[in-house]
Amino acid sequence: MAKEQKMQSSPQALKAGHLPAVKAGGMRVSKKQGNEENSAPEKNAKKTLQEKPSSVLNMTKMQAMNILAGELEKLSHDFPGEAAQIAHQKPRPTVEKTILPKRLYIIQQPRRC
């Protein structure tokens, strides 16, 4: 089988730089080449854990959390929570709107016999 592909991949068998189409069931189907150079990387390839150990990742996450906690504490002293609540409350209307009941549409239809 490998010899057959090598024979077909010779410059004489190539058309427009690729293998000619194959007929299957009366329709032309393109035939994919089995080049290792142009093939996609393996889907099951796993990253090595040696690049970034989990302990280093945990330390960087903890440092980021400590920095954020310190900043949030400073902001809470500068801006009290009551002021934030008042700023976000909706103004209450002085006059309540009365909601009218929806109008019923009665459609006259003939009775079923």
Swiss-Prot record:
Biological process, per Gene Ontology: apoptotic signaling pathway; cellular response to amino acid starvation; negative regulation of autophagy; ribosome hibernation
GO molecular function: death domain binding; ribosome binding; translation initiation factor binding; translation repressor activity
Annotated region (Disordered), positions in chain: 1-57
Keyword Phosphoprotein annotated: no
Keyword Nucleotide-binding on entry: no
Sorted UniProt keywords: Translation regulation
Subunit note: Associates with ribosomes; preventing translation. Interacts with eiF5a (eif5a and eif5a2); preventing translation.
Protein purpose: Ribosome-binding protein that promotes ribosome hibernation, a process during which ribosomes are stabilized in an inactive state and preserved from proteasomal degradation. Acts via its association with eiF5a (eif5a and eif5a2) at the polypeptide exit tunnel of the ribosome, preventing mRNA translation. Plays a key role in ribosome hibernation in the mature egg by preventing mRNA translation, leading to ribosome inactivation. Ribosomes, which are produced in large quantities during oogenesis, are stored and translationally repressed in the egg and early embryo.
PANTHER family membership: DEATH-ASSOCIATED PROTEIN 1 (PTHR13177), DEATH-ASSOCIATED PROTEIN-LIKE 1 (PTHR13177:SF2)
Protein name: Death-associated protein-like 1.L
